[in-house]
Regions:
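Residues lining hydrophobic/aromatic ligand-binding pockets adjacent to catalytic sites
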Residues: 1-198
Length: 198
C-alpha cells in the first residue's frame, strides 16, 4: 500500500501477485460477526495432485462444487441483513460471488476493487511486478501483518482500533479483526471517515 502525502489515505494498493499460495492464510478466508459470534469462512480451493503447495497465487482455482456458496451468502444475510447499509451494498458483493471466477486471484481482485469503491477509498489498485521489497517511499507493507491463526488485531496492536456500531455489538460488544464488509454494512458512507481518523 502506498500512502498519500498525508500518510492517511492510500493512493495505491498493490496485491502480491508473485507469491505462492499460503495455506491457512486470509487469501481464501474471511471473518464476519453473526448471531453466535465470530464466524470464519473459507473458500475451498482445487488441490492439484492432492496438494496446493507451491502453486502461484494467480493460478490457484476455486472449488465451486458443493453447497458452500449458498451457505456463505446465507451467513452474510443473517449477519448483516438488519444492518443499516446491507441492502445498499450487498448486491454488488453478491454479483461478484455469483460470477464464480475460476481463480482465487480474480475473485480477490474483484472483491478488492468493489471494496475500495464502496468504502470510498480513492486508491488505485494494482499488482506487484516482482516479489520482494518495494523500492517506493511511503510504502506500508502488510503482506505478513495479518494471519487468521494469530489472534492479534493489527489495528488494535498499533493503537489504531476504534469501535463502531455492529449489529451484534449489544450481545458481544465490539468485535475487531473482521472483514471490511462488517465496517461497510454497518457504517456505509461514513466508513471512509472512520478509516481516515484511525
Amino acid at each position: 500500500m502506498v500512502l498519500s502525502r498525508d500518510r492517511v489515505v492510500p493512493s495505491a494498493v498493490y496485491l502480491e501477485a508473485f507469491e505462492n499460495y499460503q495455506k491457512q492464510s486470509w487469501r481464501n478466508r474471511c471473518r464476519i460477526l453473526g448471531p453466535r459470534g465470530r464466524e470464519d469462512w473459507s473458500f475451498p480451493i482445487v488441490h492439484r495432485n492432492g496438494s496446493h503447495n507451491g502453486i502461484p497465487i494467480t493460478e490457484l482455482e476455486i472449488d465451486w462444487s458443493g453447497d458452500w456458496l449458498r451457505r456463505f451468502k446465507g451467513a452474510l444475510e443473517t449477519a448483516y441483513g438488519s444492518s443499516a447499509f446491507f441492502e445498499y451494498y450487498y448486491d454488488g458483493l453478491r454479483d461478484i460471488l455469483d460470477s464464480r471466477p475460476s481463480r482465487l486471484w480474480d475473485l480477490n481482485l474483484l472483491c478488492m476493487e468493489w471494496l475500495l469503491s464502496a468504502l470510498g477509498v480513492p486508491a488505485e489498485l494494482g499488482s506487484s511486478i516482482s516479489y520482494g521489497r518495494c523500492p517506493v517511499e511511503n510504502v506500508l507493507d502488510l503482506r505478513t501483518a495479518f494471519h487468521p491463526k494469530r489472534e492479534n488485531d493489527y489495528l488494535a496492536c498499533h493503537g489504531l482500533g476504534r469501535p463502531y456500531f455492529q449489529v451484534f455489538s449489544p450481545r458481544f460488544g465490539f468485535t475487531g479483526g473482521l472483514s471490511a464488509v462488517d465496517l461497510l454494512f454497518n457504517e456505509g458512507p461514513a466508513s471512509i471517515t472512520y478509516l481516515k481518523i484511525l
